[in-house]
């Protein structure tokens, strides 16, 4: 009888004790990192698009091997992507020409981790043609997009359930330069500085990088000044801010260089520190810089060079932000349009747009060197890679 009483008492105490919530229950860490791949779905002058939408893949965190999971609802050429910090929404530019009476678009998706599906939510006008880049502001309330043709940038509010609202602010760039591809402005990137909140818009056609202020209350982009004026005919394509230092790295597509500069908190240029070439002296092949990224550690910088070269360049970042070349590595395909370092910093995935492959490299954490893993995955016309949670 005493034994029964003790068992009943134990059961009552257990039932009355604190219960672990779903958040408190320890879950084993997944061995897969989810990432999304933007593609071209139609033939354009510079590419034979063979994709069917945005692709969802997983990467093995231990080996770097990748495997297909799902394809999004069909949309036209979702070439460049942005993943919302909420881990739920993915946004894509629809890179096409809407015609004389219309514009291209930006699409919102919802990601379901249970079945890896990417469901279409809505799309809105990009207020331009051939949008080629987009990013999410620091507050998570806006998508910012760059229209290559027409040379404009646009601010799109994120509304209920992750859908996009119509544009709240539009800025058109002016001017051009001397290269045949610079007959007009061609906006190629728009990003917000992670600390001071100011916005930089890169224009390949105008040879300019503009500084804007984002007014989240008024929902507007307000021009402040020309931030950086690269050399004539440089064709600035993308920039990347150092995660800790007030240093910016400018990838000049047309002349194949990276320019290193320091700036103030108000995005005022202070000093141009270095100009380093993607190719060795005497290499007369035409350069075509594409993507530029900094390793999560802040110690290394990488850039891709397309055209005849098809390489990934690796650099060590010095104490003053200067770049010291580590080496050049074959992309193992044609046109490395983009690459991405996974959030852990251990692996790099390279998207070879014109040979339909994604290649996995391992990154030496001490030296920044790239190590071939042997993993190559066939993916139709990959243009952009974005990891979930990055």
Regions inferred by a protein language model and the residue ranges of each:
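C-terminal motif of bacterial Sec signal peptides marking the signal peptidase cleavage site
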Residues: 14-15
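Beta-strand-rich domains and repeat architectures in extracellular enzymes and scaffolds
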Residues: 26-60, 70-85, 189
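Short glycine/acidic-enriched loop and turn motifs that connect beta-strands
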Residues: 41-45, 95-100, 149-152, 206-208, ...
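Short loop/turn segments immediately following beta-strands, especially the blade-tip
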Residues: 57-64, 108-116, 155-166, 212-220, ...
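A short beta-strand motif characteristic of beta-propeller blades
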Residues: 67-73, 119-124, 175-181, 223-229, ...
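Beta-rich, blade/repeat-based domains predominating
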Residues: 75-85, 127-138, 174-196, 230-247, ...
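Asp-box/WD-like beta-propeller blade repeats and closely related beta-sheet repeat scaffolds
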Residues: 116-189
